Amino acid sequence: MGGTASGPGVRSGPQSGPGPRRRRLRGFLAAAVAAGLSTHGLLPRVLRTWGATGPEKTAPLPGDELIPDADDVWTMAVTVAARPGQVWPWLVQMGVDRAGLYSYTAVENGLLRLGVTNADRIHPEWQDLKVGDIIAFTPGGYPGGRRGPRVVDLAQDRHLVLDSSPGAPPGTVTGTWQFVLHDAGPSGTRLLLRTRYGAGRPAGLRVMDFLLRPGYLVMDRAMLLGIKKRAEGGANGPPSSAPH
């Protein structure tokens, strides 16, 4: 009989490609990488100057002089329908172990387990902020202990400058958080938040900052809206819609 016999275990054609499960895994990984690149490429580009006007993005602000060679600068801004003196008390009482950070509580408590309570009123007992004080981002008992940026300059109703330089040599400022209040008409305030990073930031921290940058920006934007909501509620009655 002519021809070639074939039977169980004998392949008569070329091997097939990856199975459905492997193809799905590859597709998922490709989508995850694309989402990560998009998040780190697009989101920071959109949010790093969220709300800021052209002049506000480049205008010198109190605290800029601490890092004259900054290699990464973000400037966000929001208009608040309240006077600077009505916005200021919400700034000086910030801290996870005080009035909170006015951002997304679900992230602060559900994900990060910070135990934050974001205040909806001004606390007189937390208004005496001074140079050298820490605005806590993590509470005592948290891994690493109570940590956060340190106040290096403040002028009531005008600006609050924080040194955010973990891991830097003593006396070296490699990161700042700068809140600035500008008059915006008879009953308004422009609230600016500028974040500056210097070239001397430790390599490990630079990598962490890059990975977490989208989250930082989203939380910072929510914080500004949270301050706006609270200040407007105290000045003009019902607050606007914002995170709490």
Regions found by a protein language model. Name each.
Residues P243-H244:
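Acidic, Ser/Thr-rich low-complexity intrinsically disordered segments
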Residues G2-G3, I67, T79, P84-G85, ...:
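Glycine-rich portal/gate segments that line the openings of hydrophobic small-molecule binding cavities
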Residues R83-Q86, G215, M219, M223:
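Short amphipathic alpha-helical segments
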Residues T4-P20, P239-S240:
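Intrinsically disordered, low-complexity terminal tails and inter-domain linkers enriched
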Residues Y197-D220:
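A short acidic/glycine-rich loop-to-helix N-cap element
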Residues A30, P89-V96, D209, R213-Y216:
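Short hydrophobic helices that act as membrane-entry/anchoring signals
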Residues L47-V73, V80-A81:
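N-terminal signal-anchor transmembrane helix
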Residues P18-R45:
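Hydrophobic alpha-helical topogenic segments used for membrane insertion/localization
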